[in-house]
């Protein structure tokens, strides 16, 4: 199994997430990376050059695929504890498993507990296991 965290570190970036999708009957393996002060094209190219020969030997799927390396974007899904830890100070919209929707600024994430400050300046805590989906957002 490929250690994407270690390979990303070699390129000076952090591994965020990966996915294998099918678009127009093509398999695409996407690797998302982050970096303080933002990811640039050179970062994506460096990781792509490092990953390509490794994926030729250990492909993420059977058959042909295209490798894409990019930033997850300003508005992105938060699916893992490390996604939340790396998004401190950002705004997030969350849907809980019980259907309740909440939003606010991420204050902290520790021991699987997310602390948010809502628009009403209330501080709330949410257990990671209660989150159905979460996504950062930008106020323009």
UniProtKB/Swiss-Prot annotation:
Protein's GO biological process: ribosomal small subunit assembly; translation
Entry annotated with the keyword Cytoplasm: yes
Broad class of where this protein is predominantly found: cytoplasm
Domain of life: Bacteria
Cellular compartment(s): Cytoplasm
UniProt keywords, alphabetically: Cytoplasm, Ribosome biogenesis
Protein's UniProt keywords contain tRNA-binding: no
GO cellular component, one term: cytosol
Functional description taken from the UniProt entry: Required for maturation of 30S ribosomal subunits.
Family assignment from sequence similarity: Belongs to the RimP family.
PANTHER family found in the cross-reference section: RIBOSOME MATURATION FACTOR RIMP
Name of the protein described by the UniProt record: Ribosome maturation factor RimP
Organism: Campylobacter hominis (strain ATCC BAA-381 / DSM 21671 / CCUG 45161 / LMG 19568 / NCTC 13146 / CH001A)
